Amino acid sequence: MSRLIFEARRRLAPPSSHQGTIIIEAPPELPRVIPPSLLRRALPYLIGILIVGMIVALVATGMRVISPQTLFFPFVLLLAATALYRGNDKKMRTEEVDAERADYLRYLSVVRDNIRAQAAEQRASALWSHPDPTALASVPGSRRQWERDPHDPDFLVLRAGRHTVPLATTLRVNDTADEIDLEPVSHSALRSLLDTQRSIGDVPTGIDLTKVSPITVLGERAQVRAVLRAWIAQAVTWHDPTVLGVALAARDLEGRDWNWLKWLPHVDIPGRLDALGPARNLSTDPDELIALLGPVLADRPAFTGQPTDALRHLLIVVDDPDYDLGASPLAVGRAGVTVVHCSASAPHREQYSDPEKPILRVAHGAIERWQTGGWQPYIDAADQFSADEAAHLARRLSRWDSNPTHAGLRSAATRGASFTTLLGIEDASRLDVPALWAPRRRDEELRVPIGVTGTGEPLMFDLKDEAEGGMGPHGLMIGMTGSGKSQTLMSILLSLLTTHSAERLIVIYADFKGEAGADSFRDFPQVVAVISNMAEKKSLADRFADTLRGEVARREMLLREAGRKVQGSAFNSVLEYENAIAAGHSLPPIPTLFVVADEFTLMLADHPEYAELFDYVARKGRSFRIHILFASQTLDVGKIKDIDKNTAYRIGLKVASPSVSRQIIGVEDAYHIESGKEHKGVGFLVPAPGATPIRFRSTYVDGIYEPPQTAKAVVVQSVPEPKLFTAAAVEPDPGTVIADTDEQEPADPPRKLIATIGEQLARYGPRAPQLWLPPLDETIPLSAALARAGVGPRQWRWPLGEIDRPFEMRRDPLVFDARSSAGNMVIHGGPKSGKSTALQTFILSAASLHSPHEVSFYCLDYGGGQLRALQDLAHVGSVASALEPERIRRTFGELEQLLLSRQQREVFRDRGANGSTPDDGFGEVFLVIDNLYGFGRDNTDQFNTRNPLLARVTELVNVGLAYGIHVIITTPSWLEVPLAMRDGLGLRLELRLHDARDSNVRVVGALRRPADAVPHDQPGRGLTMAAEHFLFAAPELDAQTNPVAAINARYPGMAAPPVRLLPTNLAPHAVGELYRGPDQLVIGQREEDLAPVILDLAANPLLMVFGDARSGKTTLLRHIIRTVREHSTADRVAFTVLDRRLHLVDEPLFPDNEYTANIDRIIPAMLGLANLIEARRPPAGMSAAELSRWTFAGHTHYLIIDDVDQVPDSPAMTGPYIGQRPWTPLIGLLAQAGDLGLRVIVTGRATGSAHLLMTSPLLRRFNDLQATTLMLAGNPADSGKIRGERFARLPAGRAILLTDSDSPTYVQLINPLVDAAAVSGETQQKGSQS
């Protein structure tokens, strides 16, 4: 049986029905009467009696003539009595009550008329959606046939009869204080009005099949069938077979009651045939019907009571009272399935009533519903449909079938606006791209349909400039949330992209908020970029602005150069350029650039400076074929400035206020567009300023695309014979063959229409030019950066990352040039901004292109310890942390010695162009300081708030660059960089800062700091001083790709010179000759340059040594005694040793030398020594010439006092030297000790030494004379300071040497007890140090 395709059209609008609120004024209130007290009631009468009494008294006394003055007092009393009687009486008069009641009743009559008008509208709307069943026969073939779809509110709502329903309009009475005070008649009238008008009787009422799963119907068989026929008739009249299927199981299937169902297309089984055509979901056995429906029911989810727009709804009727539905598969609720069971089993009286599984009973022309405990009215007058009426309706519908190419589960309104239909595409999954992209006439270019108008005609969107007959170049679209703005934008873009190649059109989609719809176009070949989520990634907004400026400049330059080449002067527009191409000149095409700026008002709120950008591009773009569509949810005239003045066409979707609608389209119609998803995409287009708005609905392109299906089976019969068309399946005759075609093609996974088209377009033609490079969001491996930079080895240049230059539409390597003025570098960044990682990249990149003899690195790690990962790299000479102060000092010592060495060699200044330098083993040297803030706060105290080594860093920055010594530092704050150092740091790179206000990067005229655009979640991302974004390459230091071992393997046997440290135990032979001349002894090795430390006792004959126990004091004395004795004779040197603890008792002295450990011997020994030295003074009476030539005769005397703090400085209490102090004879000789041959060496404990220098006469004199001082190990908290230096916890033998110079020096003292086989270096201590 052949059928005609029914083409559904736009649904006719039903009569309007308001669902607002009618507010009713409350009835008038009567004043509450409060009875007065007895006294108040009696007082007027008492006053009246008093007045009469006064008058009688006046008359009785003979006052015949009463003056007015006499009557004044009675008159006042009369007024008071009247006031007391009437003053507080709140009781309303009867006339007043009657008047207020009449006014209110007249008001209620007006309200009643309004309510009745609302009720009439509601009834008319209900009758339109649910007409009487007798009127259904006139619907087939009309515009109303199959008008409902899943987006309509009455979809799958079947009329069941007429019932009393609540009024859709809410009736609300204004609040009153208390109903007791209301006027009774008015109150009663109001109550009567509300009780009567809140419901409407005899209104068509329906059953929503989406909210129920099984429906059980009881009652007399004929009435039940009549009711079900009415339900089915309503369902098949209003719903397309693609959205609703009907199935029936009845014993008397071929009877008059159900035989008519065979004519309906809704019962057909897709893809199955019998002898007469499509098979039908009709059966006499419910189980057989379930088998037919098995494939359809198998994959359906459980019933939820919610609409299922993506599933075809099934209405299954089981007319078999004896069938146990609860034991069948149909008892399981499934989404999109409603089962109606005609049953004869009444519910148990305690059976629970389930709203999703109603039990209905048809009785006496009405329908009742089972509620817990009994039957309740459900439908007052049930609809019934006779078998003849049903057969007539079914035959009228039998001639129609739904359109096999339409998806079915879409709005009837959008079916008429199908994207493929408007573009003439039969199958979007098999596009003829060459035909779609075929060259067009200019008047047809950029002109595409994007929807349908209110009359059903295609709405053409013409992007061309108005001078070329279009609507452009620029437009404005406004639509609130839910209005279909994204749907309309996608429709415009998909139409343009489907019909134009990248040689004619390219697109930039900029979405400030980051909607998902924008990403759908990312893979189209014409799409230059999809820029989304600019609200969170502010750098994207800056790149977008730079890209637009750059494209305008690029096109302007292209027109200028091409015009000069062709005609001698620049082309004024792309139109002239294309005319030159048409004239035969070989020029590359310039495609139209279509820019969609979605949510541009939000962009302007965060970036107000972009208003000028859009204005500039809009003005310049008119000639350069750059078209912009501005889209947003609202229109803020104060923010958009002159943008709206540059737009030609306007699109207004649903907006939030009439004023916005007037601003967009000139009238308020956009505000009055109805809300709801069924009205998404409805709007008005104003093609030109002042034109009449055109109402339209855009096509829906964001849904799943289902390609059209073709029949896979045909019926072949050799001898045609008539067959009886029955409801049940008709078996074919032996001569009939139902032949299947080829095997079913495997079904592709569901895909959206945009993705389906985009995948095909990507395989054709050229892609859009790369105007937009992706932002620096992806990590750049160091290996990739090295490959892209193309820098060769031994050029003293290496890449650090990439610089983003969106204006020029390219990325350039970020290259460090060691031989340039930017040879010193500072990296400024906040916490976790990637500073330490950047240093790793810097070192590894240099090491990848140079040998350890060409570049070497010395690192001070005050950061997170990340530089420690590079300590095994051959190019790294040392990595020192904050816990290694000695290594830090030695690093500076090595670099300063290198600087001094190169300064002394003038040839270093004459390095050749090839970088050749005198070979000192270092090459280009880099001092790398990670975290200058931490470095500057190290080695400080309350008097020295900055690290003294900062001055040495500043010296290297300002002087070292000319001698191949570079400084690379990182700092969290630019303020931490000393002023004297800043000018020497030629390269400044700024990473993300904690506060953008600390940034040093500025752009003249910009309203925002460029640092605001640096992402917070991307370490290594930053700005150059030119405000260009860059990204450091990642050093790739993971376990699998660690480059350290690979780089070291390329340079076997080569390494940067290490930082040499002082040995922890210094053997005498390690410093060479110990005795460098009279009174010149080598006592150790200096940390600064590892040179020997010479103690010149002739220049400064006084030496103080302080240190805690086992720090090396006595060991130094032992070394001095041995060295002097071994290189002197008894006639030249003599010793006086005061050793309280007998540590030096085994040291051999010269004969007759004084050694004592007895405190009683100290005073006579000092007296004898003082007399001896005093005798060396020149005698009196010598001339000046004699004095200048005079020298003392005798030996040099060494006074060695070990542990001077152990010798009491108090006067002797007994003996021959009573009252004398031990050091008094000596103190007077100390100032001339050098001239008189006296050398005094004292040692003492570190603890309390600062106090002793102020209290002990001997030590105070030493300090006054600036004696050479050695500060060995001591507790910094207990020992105080000596000449501004604090003791430190040092290894044994390590000391701070204080001389008359400004700076202290760390030294390692010689240990004479070290075994001769011990070598100089970081060896374990051999021999004791005390």
From Swiss-Prot:
Cross-referenced SMART domains, in alphabetical order?
AAA
The residues the record assigns to binding ATP are 479-486, 829-836, 1107-1114
The record's Gene Ontology cellular component field reads: peptidoglycan-based cell wall; plasma membrane
Q: What is its main location?
A: membrane
Coiled-coil ranges from the UniProt annotation: none
**Boundaries of each FtsK domain copy?**
456-662, 811-1000, 1090-1280
What topology does the record note for this protein and the membrane?
A: Multi-pass membrane protein
Q: What does this protein do?
A: Part of the ESX-3 specialized secretion system, which is important for iron and zinc uptake or homeostasis.
Query: What's the subunit arrangement here?
Result: Part of the ESX-3 / type VII secretion system (T7SS), which is composed of cytosolic and membrane components. The ESX-3 membrane complex is composed of EccB3, EccC3, EccD3 and EccE3.
Additional remarks: Was identified as a high-confidence drug target.
Q: What is this protein called?
A: ESX-3 secretion system protein EccC3
Q: Which organism is it from?
A: Mycobacterium tuberculosis (strain ATCC 25618 / H37Rv)
Taxonomic classification, please? Bacteria, Bacillati, Actinomycetota, Actinomycetes, Mycobacteriales
